[in-house]
Amino acid sequence: MTAGPTDPTPTSQIRNFSIIAHVDHGKSTLADRILEQLGAMGERDKRDQTLDTLELERERGITIKSTPIRLEYTRENGEGYVFNLIDTPGHVDFNYEVSRSLAACEGVLLLVDASQGVEAQTIVNAYLAIDNNLEIVPVINKIDLPAADPEGAARELEEVIGIPAEDAVRASGKTGIGIPEILEAVVERIPPPAGDPGAPLKALIFDSFFDAYQGVILFVRVLEGTMKAKDGVRLMNAGKNFEVDKVGTFSPGLVVGQELSAGMVGWVAAGIKDIQDAQVGDTLTGSDRQTAEPFPGFKPAQPVVFSGLYPTDTEDYRKLRDALEKLKLNDAAFSFEPETSEALGFGFRCGFLGLLHAEIIQERLEREYDLDLIATAPAVVYRVTLTNGEIFETQNPAEFPTRDRIEKVEEPYIKLSVMLPEDYVGPVMQLLQERRGSMQTMNYVGKRVELVYEVPFAEILYDFHDRLKSISRGYASMDYEQLGYREGDLRKVDIMVNNEVIDALAVIVHESKTYSLGRKIVDKMAEVIPRQMFPVPVQAVIGAKIIARATVKAYRKDVLAKCYGGDISRKKKLLEKQKKGRARMKQFGTVEVPQEAFLAVLSTEE
């Protein structure tokens, strides 16, 4: 950490803005050019995607975490301005991160790829910005591409979102064309922040991360008042008081400053030790002079996909719990609670925003915390009434009682609303019908349609979000609310490998789908289970009735096994490689079931 500038900039000279775009429209590259133009990147810092701080982000070429940075800009007439640029993720899974970052800004640069035109996320992001009353500066990016059609892209912007085509700045993040015009547009078009530095403190937490030495570091946008070291502050949602240790700005690292006042974006360290206290979207206020009301409109993100995560080595359970708690701090949209499995031992049931989110969390756990994990099929909480009148709830298919003991089974239903362009209504309605949905209403909003369905929650858990996106080419967006429980004709399908039931692979499914799902699972499992010296039967069963079977054929005997000679170090290397592969597996009786088998259950819809 370094010491930063001490004199507070007048709010009229501050501009807080964000860059939003569809995935792959060149947002991080454009941010790099802006940083370069304003001298925020030294020669040694020059690398692509400067604001993408996670190694995983640069590898996949996507932005996952929102990263802020403070920049200084001087106009030709000598006027100095402070820009706070808050980089946001572009993938649909991370919409929550985008909405929080936008709440900290007064305006946005809306990027559109000149060769692709307006895409789904462009529209979603533009509406997010409009909902937050932000000034939109449209930028047609990648005009240097051979396939670029900047005029067409500008026209689309006007037709779809209603932004006048002549307002769009033409630019190229790669070559740096148009960057000076963008910087001028930020000063001219984006309003300075409002707010009274003398009012009681009111600051919005839009992100946070855990630092081993200072505890939780909060990323805040100060809306009213002033905050400096030694001030008493209160987290309004958590209802807890703390003393500020340090405040500062970003450049892109943390730079210690004297104070943060109305209009500024910065960070606060206040010795907050408990991860759960630092909820993103909470309001920070003075402990003695409190603001009248917290920042409105923040709701915690609702996870869409649920899955169990188990360490392959049971001794890593505590390490996994600590890692999940730390990740939760950096990712408000992720939830988890403990669960157990006979086959896999102790683990956690985790909630994610989508499959990319789930994949990234699992990858981060494995990389950053050096854990080996197995992920199970997603499920919901079922309510079972037994023949003796007893009622209990379970989300673990392994705990499901036998058919003869069940009076009735109830499953959670949701009210699902889907917004989509009218061209895709047919295929989306068909998808909802396949998922046992019943249609409630259908409303036309301009050229878009809102479908409202009542659907069993379990039906949207597997891959519904992804199927919806692919059917609608990414244009459909969904939201849901819980409706409570309803009776359903549900069955538990067990999977047996070599005549042994594997509890972690059990699924609960509607009677109408038992055969097709059982068939898909056993066929997929037979592909991924390694061949043994003997044939291995893989069966799907309901109670004692076998509904589907596949066989993993036996190896023929390896006649080369008795060969001598060969390089010993080569043999060692192969043995070592095999050992690593085995660590990813759990032993069930005599047959090893690899991680792919658990994933096969997840991807049966493909």
UniProtKB/Swiss-Prot annotation:
Superkingdom per UniProt: Bacteria
Gene Ontology terms for molecular function: GTP binding; GTPase activity; ribosome binding; translation elongation factor activity
Enzyme type, top EC level: hydrolase
Main localisation: membrane
Reactions listed under catalytic activity: GTP + H2O = GDP + phosphate + H(+)
Any Gene Ontology biological process: positive regulation of translation
Residues that hold GTP according to the record: 24-29, 141-144
Any one GO CC term of the record: plasma membrane
Localization annotation: Cell membrane
Known EC number: 3.6.5.n1
ATP-binding keyword on record: no
CDD domains according to UniProt: EF4_II, EF4_III, LepA, lepA_C
Annotated protein name in UniProt: Elongation factor 4
The organism of origin for this protein: Deinococcus radiodurans (strain ATCC 13939 / DSM 20539 / JCM 16871 / CCUG 27074 / LMG 4051 / NBRC 15346 / NCIMB 9279 / VKM B-1422 / R1)
